[in-house]
Amino acid sequence: MDAKMGYIFKVMRWIFCFVACGITFGCTNSGFQNANSRPCILSMNRMIHDCVERVVGNRLATAVLIKGSLDPHAYEMVKGDKDKIAGSAVIFCNGLGLEHTLSLRKHLENNPNSVKLGERLIARGAFVPLEEDGICDPHIWMDLSIWKEAVIEITEVLIEKFPEWSAEFKANSEELVCEMSILDSWAKQCLSTIPENLRYLVSGHNAFSYFTRRYLATPEEVASGAWRSRCISPEGLSPEAQISVRDIMAVVDYINEHDVSVVFPEDTLNQDALKKIVSSLKKSHLVRLAQKPLYSDNVDDNYFSTFKHNVCLITEELGGVALECQR
């Protein structure tokens, strides 16, 4: 009898531990839940996630789907992603074709909880979208004057979903937008110290058009469209595309035409194309790779510090002065 009772107690102890773990770490069918059973807000990437965190504070749980150095252009869902999407109260996507793989589209399109920030911004005329060969450029986080508008969209969605915390979300959002405005002005000041004849950006792939239009071009160039001559890359909007000899030669000609002395590799991209370009120019033109890589489709520590990194690196490598940032 004692042995039987001991067995029963042992089984009950295991059941208790299992249930406790489920409460603490589980994801129920009705949504992500943590120890406090807070609804979860899922962001597709860190550029969105870092803004969402600032807006919600500690009122809601937050999570990010595409982490680390993974390429958002080519991301295919892995085990557990389906549950994360199904269990989230709101899913913030960049939109504009960034989340275009079949597995992501299957679970995001027609999902009532999915919010495409880029499309919402275009619908209310918040910015002028850029295109390449008829494809919309999704890299809007590169321009803080656009991305702070995304914060406003995020806030409006969250207030509609959770009106009980509207005052707190609005206050957090206003503080963040103010900080982003200061950071935007700082970036313009830094990059304006680069001599105008040196403001030419050669990067790994075409992720810096919004950045160039906002921070490297003159007002006259923005108005006329001539700002496009301020940047080039061997790869297109997505790093998935194959690079041709013609693409490489176009960059070589650009470097010679504008007397470019430094080209910028990107953290997540293979540097072979840029190395070939530098190598092919060795005898006729002195050009080198920047000492550090730029971040385009991912972040280093967080979105805001990564933006500062890119601004400082481009400014200093192109002959400008990186001013002290107050934020």
UniProtKB/Swiss-Prot annotation:
Record SUPFAM superfamilies: Helical backbone' metal receptor
Record-linked InterPro entries: AdhesinB (IPR006129), Bact_metal-bind_prot9 (IPR050492), Lipoprotein_PsaA-like (IPR006128), ZnuA-like (IPR006127)
Ligand binding (Fe(2+)): 73, 139, 205, 297
Localization: Periplasm
Molecular functions per Gene Ontology: metal ion binding
Keyword Metal-binding: yes
Single biological process term from Gene Ontology: cell adhesion
Keywords: Iron, Metal-binding, Periplasm, Signal, Transport
An example Gene Ontology CC term for this record: periplasmic space
Main subcellular localisation: periplasm
Pfam family, one: ZnuA
The keyword Iron is assigned to this record: yes
Similarity field: Belongs to the bacterial solute-binding protein 9 family.
Function of the molecule: Part of the ATP-binding cassette (ABC) transport system YtgABCD involved in metal import. Binds Fe(2+), Mn(2+) and Ni(2+), with a preference for Fe(2+) and delivers them to the membrane permease for translocation into the cytoplasm.
Subunit note: Monomer.
Name used for this protein in its record: Metal-binding protein YtgA
Natural source organism: Chlamydia pneumoniae (Chlamydophila pneumoniae)
